[in-house]
Amino acid sequence: MNIDQSKIPQATAKRLPLYYRFLKNLHASGKQRVSSAELSDAVKVDSATIRRDFSYFGALGKKGYGYNVDYLLTFFRKTLDQDEMTNVMLIGVGNLGTAFLHYNFIKNNNTKISMAFDVNESKIGSEIGGVPVYDLDKLEEHVQEVGDIPVAILTVPAVAAQPITDRLIALGIKGILNFTPARLNVPEHIRIHHIDLAVELQSLVYFLKHYSITQED
């Protein structure tokens, strides 16, 4: 089945890796089929939403039977390009950046941090989690040597985020995962995801104080 991925709602697309991770766990445990209710309980997404998400991809299950785990796993592996490796660069090897290098998305088959950059001389030239750390001043040199690194993770001070982003744009970056408080200006063809941990924490505290669980959607 040929599916126009651009017509899949972004909210649905963001949930696909969550479904895929749970299906991998089911497959590893030997489970052969799963219902939308079981999926719902595991991933904390209501079953109606799961059925709607899956409906964008055609008939993935059978009424009264549920979903075949092997079939779903194979389908979502292909949909999420799990067999195609995407190299990622990390910029900013502070506490958060160092944690990313040690983790390096080992549970993902299709993403890998292949190089990191920093300005700290004590880190330049070292390896952290098997990832080489280079001088940020030589960003262009190292990226051009390697070639295709379409994604960058930013874990730098906010004041440095936009100037570094401008350099990444010039290098042809396609996507940025931004962990800085800065709201970055990028061309329309570049996708950027902002993850501000301080804002997320403040939002959580606000909801705890002012909303009960039953009030939320």
UniProtKB/Swiss-Prot annotation:
One GO CC term on file: cytoplasm
GO biological-process terms attached to the record: negative regulation of DNA-templated transcription; response to redox state
SMART domains xrefs: CoA_binding
Annotated residues for binding of NAD(+): G92, V93, G94, N95, L96, G97
InterPro entries on file: CoA-bd, NAD(P)-bd_dom_sf, Rex_DNA-bd_C_dom, Tscrpt_rep_Rex, WH-like_DNA-bd_sf, WH_DNA-bd_sf
Location(s), subcellular: Cytoplasm
Keyword entries, A-Z: Cytoplasm, DNA-binding, NAD, Repressor, Transcription, Transcription regulation
PANTHER family, A to Z: REDOX-SENSING TRANSCRIPTIONAL REPRESSOR REX (PTHR35786), REDOX-SENSING TRANSCRIPTIONAL REPRESSOR REX 1 (PTHR35786:SF1)
Family label: Belongs to the transcriptional regulatory Rex family.
Subunit structure: Homodimer.
HAMAP family registered for this protein in UniProt: Rex
Protein name per Swiss-Prot or TrEMBL: Redox-sensing transcriptional repressor Rex
Gene source species: Bacillus pumilus (strain SAFR-032)
